[in-house]
């Protein structure tokens, strides 16, 4: 008799995704981040659901309701900080997942990659709107500054901003709709993640060598289930340590001051995971130019399959490309640091140089390095 997991319509899908899936035998821990992102998303949806039970999306009571969650709700402080720091863990996993894709040439699976970039945009939008909800100083001014960027769009810009605000400034209407969008978007992210997985399983996973692994596959369970469980335990340990020992480490102290439209904080800055993009935005003196650079800093990922000039898929055997890749990582860390600094000398010029280097590396230097390596290896 055939096993039920191979015949039952629903179990069959689970089986072909998580149990009998043929996986390459040599994928490293860099391939763990897909499952870790899934865990992060589930965790965020669950903690978010419980927070939504006690939160009120009204300008008069939003800040107080978050205080109430932390002080009066059973383990409310834990749920709130799990959610806030869970977002940080989510982005750490996202950046490492994207970095893995760049290093090992996973972007050659174009449908999977493009949906991944859409997922990145969706998660960034969700995180931005979530940051507005506590209605602290940085929530209010962050929302004002970032939504205001849309006014740089010619002709329709101002109307668009006022339409998003639901008035002439960030106010009750803005907070209410941001809460609605923040609630619905994670479910859209979950659906997109399902499509992401669907396209991945059409081709099978890539592997560190970038070569076809069809001749050497192993079942996902038990080999990679146990490996994913180890990754999950490390993730939970890291998140628990952050939440229980220094929950405010990655937050902004200004967000413990209730939103005040009459008082601007000295340094308006987003959460740490947006700082690299914020630095690129600020490095261009022109408003529209800055907005375009900001969008293109993420959108450039969509061009990766077109910029791939190497005859090898992975960077595993390409030392020049490896050096440029790690230079790109260092550059992104520099941009993250600059994004959190005030707009003054020498930070402005460092930010401008780092922004130029970012686009130069991706659009010019890495494709040229690949061509040089093709010649050196006589391919």
Swiss-Prot record:
Its cofactor is heme b. Pfam families: Cytochrom_B_C, Cytochrome_B. GO terms for biological process: mitochondrial electron transport, ubiquinol to cytochrome c. GO terms for molecular function: metal ion binding; ubiquinol-cytochrome-c reductase activity. This is Cytochrome b. Heme b b562 binds at residues 83, 182. The keyword NADP does not apply. The chain crosses the membrane at residues 33-53, 77-98, 113-133, 178-198, 226-246, 288-308, 320-340, 347-367. A ubiquinone binds at residue 201. It is a multi-pass membrane protein. It is found in: Mitochondrion inner membrane. GO terms for cellular component: mitochondrial inner membrane; respiratory chain complex III. InterPro entries: Cyt_b/b6_C, Cyt_b/b6_C_sf, Cyt_b/b6_N, Cytb/b6-like_sf, Cytochrome_b, Cytochrome_b_C_euk/bac, Cytochrome_b_N_euk/bac, Di-haem_cyt_TM. It comes from the Eukaryota. Heme 1 (or BL or b562) is low-potential and absorbs at about 562 nm, and heme 2 (or BH or b566) is high-potential and absorbs at about 566 nm. Binds 2 heme b groups non-covalently. The keyword Metal-binding applies. The cytochrome bc1 complex contains 11 subunits: 3 respiratory subunits (MT-CYB, CYC1 and UQCRFS1), 2 core proteins (UQCRC1 and UQCRC2) and 6 low-molecular weight proteins (UQCRH/QCR6, UQCRB/QCR7, UQCRQ/QCR8, UQCR10/QCR9, UQCR11/QCR10 and a cleavage product of UQCRFS1). This cytochrome bc1 complex then forms a dimer. Component of the ubiquinol-cytochrome c reductase complex (complex III or cytochrome b-c1 complex) that is part of the mitochondrial respiratory chain. The b-c1 complex mediates electron transfer from ubiquinol to cytochrome c. Contributes to the generation of a proton gradient across the mitochondrial membrane that is then used for ATP synthesis. Belongs to the cytochrome b family. Heme b b566 binds at residues 97, 196. Changing residue 257 to T: In strain: Isolate TM-2 and Isolate TM-3. Keywords: Electron transport, Heme, Iron, Membrane, Metal-binding, Mitochondrion, Mitochondrion inner membrane, Respiratory chain, Transmembrane, Transmembrane helix, Transport, Ubiquinone.
